[in-house]
Amino acid sequence: MVRFFGLNKKKNEEKENTDLPADNEQNAAETSSSNVSGNEERIDPNSHDTNPENANNDDASTTFGSSIQSSSIFSRGRMTYGTGASSSMATSEMRSHSSGHSGSKNSKNLQGFKDVGKPLRAVSFLSPVKEEESQDTQNTLDVSSSTSSTLATSENARENSFTSRRSITLEYIHKSLSELEENLVDIMDDIHQDVISISKAVIEAIEYFKEFLPTTRDRIPYRISLEKSSSLRKINKIVLHFLDNLLVSDAFSNSRSILLRRFYFFLKKLNLITDDDLISESGVLPCLSVFCIGSHCNLPSMDKLGMILDELTKMDSSIISDQEGAFIAPILRGITPKSSILTIMFGLPNLQHEHYEMIKVLYSLFPDVHMYCVKDYIKKAASAVGSIPSHTAATIDTIAPTKFQFSPPYAVSENPLELPISMSLSTETSAKITGTLGGYLFPQTGSDKKFSQFASCSFAITCAHVVLSEKQDYPNVMVPSNVLQTSYKKVLTKESDRYPDGSVEKTAFLEEVQRIDQNLNWQKSNKFGQVVWGERAIVDHRLSDFAIIKVNSSFKCQNTLGNGLKSFPDPTLRFQNLHVKRKIFKMKPGMKVFKIGASTGYTSGELNSTKLVYWADGKLQSSEFVVASPTPLFASAGDSGAWILTKLEDRLGLGLVGMLHSYDGEQRQFGLFTPIGDILERLHAVTKIQWDIDPQLDG
């Protein structure tokens, strides 16, 4: 690898030493071409694009206004810029500079020669000339006599420009993409060989994007596919490498924004970003996001990437060591799903410079797969509660000012003996750890008398790390969580001390504290259930993290979200769609799912086709995971045990996909879960009984 880079560097140095004059000529030609494109876009009579980006073109030629500059004291010596009627050589210089330009530009520049006396605007690239007042009059006459012919040329140029856009061919587009790819690849090679600075490289990259299809201002009349265009995939990879790895420092924030915006208009021109996408023309900068690898993704390297990750999970953990919670996530990354490419995200809790160097080494592993590293890590989704913010304590009823309505930071059932799923849960003695009640499972004993004692029993399920502890083997469980109720009570008591004795406010706080005490005492007298089995272990390279709780017979157990829970953003989650009616064993990549956790409530996402690999508890593990969509939040601390659900397509009701056990602690956009099929299979292996989400039918 190093030798290859060294050879390239040597060739580049020889080329620079031998071809310097030619390079200078080429740069001048490119500058001239760029100026032509900018002016043609600006005067197109058939375009209705009012985008500020096009109105304020970045090309240097757009700094011309209606007034061409005059001789000024801003000049350091007798050398100054050719301007208006004050310089005789200005006209010839401008004609020479614009000889390869369209008639439109000549017309606009020549019109400026009549605006003598308007405010000065400095132009940096005009050739300096000697002040020779004696020739000004003759030059001005020459300009005036040529105005009519120039206007005719301008009209022809506009017509030719419009015709060329209409006659653009697919072959020409692919050729332009190939040229852009070659230019960007050369830039990236120079960066990796330290031939060019990142600042200069990103400027060159931006210029290349400006020169792409210069006569096409709006969208092309074709649809370019990432799956079929290797050049487009490589271009995307290079841009993402800039944005995610090379320009991460705050010093490059401006360059990063400009490149991202240019890339956005590039994708829009190729119809990879449509008007229906989330990115709008309101002036808000586009942003990179992560997306799931769905069933419709046919990118070439997807199968190979999946094989590598599968082999990685089979490696001996004794020869591997990494930071606790570090992970590798195969995803799609880009501005929109259609414009995204395969990406490997390396999450590390302690991100260092050497990790970015590792990305440079891995850059050439796949020609069209992006790689980047972020500060992130996998952690358990149980919550270690310290305190509850006081702003959630109470709200005043505007109708009756003397009444106070308190809103606890946890779900409360209307009937304490009918607890819906997704409520908060903790052990009776826990002081910090709290999670979510996933749902209810029922043993299917059949006619076997050996298990007849379990025939009418109901069992709740949650994550083992929420309810198992070394201090107690079979702890009692409380729903709602004892941890959340106790913390909420402390907040109210502390807040009540701020009001004088006998005040209406203090009385209201103390009444709510009394209500919480009554509920806690009732829960201790009417125990919800007791943990009878649980494990957190690696079984066949997969995490088995769940526990079953034998529910007291006085409680009515149904797998329903309940009517007493807080409102959902999805208006269809009503009536029959509140009930879990089916187990989903065949998970389809890209399937839309949601969960209702005790901490974050309702969040949605999509199933990823390839598993996530992570390092935890001294072992290499893998897990199915959900990518948050459309908002970049799926899970947080306190959501452990929440069921992953989906709306059924062929009938009313919900389908059970799995149970959440972990999430990425920094960005909280991934939710790791255990499929329901694996849970039921493991329960059958341990208990020798079949389990289901519906009670066993009599007889």
Swiss-Prot record:
Stated induction or repression of this protein's expression: Down-regulated after extracellular amino-acid addition.
Keyword Phosphoprotein: no
Membrane topology: Peripheral membrane protein
Listed InterPro entries: Peptidase_S1_PA, Peptidase_S64_Ssy5
Keywords associated with the record: Autocatalytic cleavage, Cell membrane, Hydrolase, Membrane, Protease, Zymogen
Biological process annotations from GO: protein autoprocessing; protein processing; response to amino acid
Outcome, altering residue 575 to V: In SSY5-14; constitutively active, confers 30% increased STP1 processing in the absence of amino acids
Maturation propeptide residues: 1-381
Positions of the UniProt region annotated as Disordered: 1-113, 128-158
Active site, per annotation: 465, 545, 640
Impact after mutating residue 512 to K: In SSY5-6; constitutively active, confers 30% increased STP1 processing in the absence of amino acids
Domain of life per record: Eukaryota
GO terms, molecular function: serine-type endopeptidase activity
Family: Belongs to the peptidase S64 family.
Function comment: Protease component of the SPS-sensor system, which regulates the expression of several amino acid-metabolizing enzymes and amino acid- and peptide-permeases in response to extracellular amino acid levels by controlling the activity of two transcription factors, STP1 and STP2. Catalyzes the activation of these transcription factors, which are synthesized as latent cytoplasmic precursors, by proteolytic removal of an N-terminal inhibitory domain containing cytoplasmic retention motifs. SSY5 binds as an inactive protease complex to STP1.
Subunit structure: Component of the plasma membrane SPS (SSY1-PTR3-SSY5) amino acid sensor complex.
Protein name: SPS-sensor serine protease component SSY5
Species assigned in the record: Saccharomyces cerevisiae (strain ATCC 204508 / S288c) (Baker's yeast)
Gene that produces this protein: SSY5
